[in-house]
């Protein structure tokens, strides 16, 4: 009988502070969540109708050590058990990113633990690996407040952006349309809920762009919604907000799903991964499931709602791959709000 050697588990501590969530997680072998703690600031930003960078940074300062201690306690481990610390280095709000990066550097230095920098969007993509093992080549549809892109991966750690937004990200368009309809921040979940009560009876544009393009554009759609509301007001016509929400949502989802499906076929991928905060959208999830149910050769992976919005488990998952590939950051690691995923 061959000798069985027990492989050592890789334990990664993830830290995420790119926007308005202070998050720390512990992940084993890149696939198993041991602890996942998130302190959200939505209530603090609600009255301003969006994230205020200065307020976000202050909250991160207050929360980071508390969340870090809570994650270690939940995972029932000490710093001695950790193989590496993975932290979001960008993109995001520079003041917010700095809190996480500096916390990660302090812990790495104090306990002599290797440090790995992670791209926030790589994290969103790797959230899917916490659900199911990924198979290459794959395509990820990334839809969040600041990003809307199609990312092709031929192997671990390799990211090729084959389509991206030329103006507003889908999440931005959701928030701006929600504001037009006098809905609270964040607008996405409110529009999603309202859309399910209405019918898409209002004719709104869809930006298909050039025939072979996988890029997106949502600024025209956003303007069309705002104009529709203003014109109706001026003419004294009542527009049902639920119908407007349904029409807007259908326009966004139609373009996202059609382009993702077209790209998945063209690039002959094995899986399509949904990623990012807007991945929590029920309408988008349902439409993707419907579209990919007919494609027997492409597996659709959709993360649970808790892994769609910003969290640190996804950063630890992406960080595991970087760590295993021998990537290391020095203590000179800095926040990079404009970090490129293809770099």
Swiss-Prot record:
Binds 1 Fe(2+) ion per subunit. It is found in: Cytoplasm. GO terms for biological process: tRNA threonylcarbamoyladenosine modification. Its cofactor is Fe(2+). It is an enzyme of class 2 (transferase). Disulfide bonds: none annotated. PANTHER family: TRNA N6-ADENOSINE THREONYLCARBAMOYLTRANSFERASE, TRNA N6-ADENOSINE THREONYLCARBAMOYLTRANSFERASE, MITOCHONDRIAL. This is tRNA N6-adenosine threonylcarbamoyltransferase. It comes from Bacillus cereus (strain ATCC 14579 / DSM 31 / CCUG 7414 / JCM 2152 / NBRC 15305 / NCIMB 9373 / NCTC 2599 / NRRL B-3711).
């Amino acid at each position: 009988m061959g000798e069985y050697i027990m492989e050592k588990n890789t334990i990664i501590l993830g830290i995420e502070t790119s926007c308005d969530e202070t998050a720390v997680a512990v992940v084993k072998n890149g696939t198993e969540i041991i602890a996942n703690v998130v302190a959200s600031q939505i209530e603090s930003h609600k009255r301003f109708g969006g994230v205020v960078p200065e307020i976000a940074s202050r909250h991160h300062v207050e929360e980071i050590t508390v969340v870090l201690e809570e994650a270690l306690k939940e995972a029932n481990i000490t710093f001695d058990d950790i193989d590496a610390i993975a932290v979001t280095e960008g993109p995001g709000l520079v003041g917010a990113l700095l809190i996480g990066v500096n916390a990660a550097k302090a812990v790495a230095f104090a306990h002599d633990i290797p440090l790995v920098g992670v791209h926030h969007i790589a994290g969103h993509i790797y959230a899917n690996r916490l659900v199911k093992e990924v198979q290459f080549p794959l395509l990820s549809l990334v839809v969040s407040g600041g990003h809307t892109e199609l990312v092709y991966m031929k192997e671990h750690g390799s990211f090729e952006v084959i389509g991206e937004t030329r103006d507003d990200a889908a999440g931005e368009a959701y928030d701006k349309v929600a504001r037009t309809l006098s809905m609270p921040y964040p607008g996405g979940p409110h529009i999603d809920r309202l859309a399910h009560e209405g019918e898409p009876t209002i004719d709104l544009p869809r930006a298909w762009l050039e025939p072979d393009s996988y890029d997106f554009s949502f600024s025209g759609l956003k303007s069309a919604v705002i104009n529709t509301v203003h014109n109706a007001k001026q003419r004294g016509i009542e527009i049902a907000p639920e119908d407007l929400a349904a029409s807007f949502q259908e326009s966004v989802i139609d373009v996202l799903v059609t382009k993702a499906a077209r790209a998945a076929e063209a690039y002959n991928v094995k899986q399509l991964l949904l990623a990012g905060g807007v991945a929590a959208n029920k309408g988008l999830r349902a439409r993707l499931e419907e579209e990919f149910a007919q494609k027997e050769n492409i597996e659709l992976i959709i993360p649970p709602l808790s892994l769609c919005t910003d969290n640190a488990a996804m950063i630890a998952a992406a960080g595991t791959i970087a760590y295993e590939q021998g990537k290391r950051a020095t203590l000179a690691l800095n926040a990079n709000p404009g970090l490129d995923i293809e770099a």
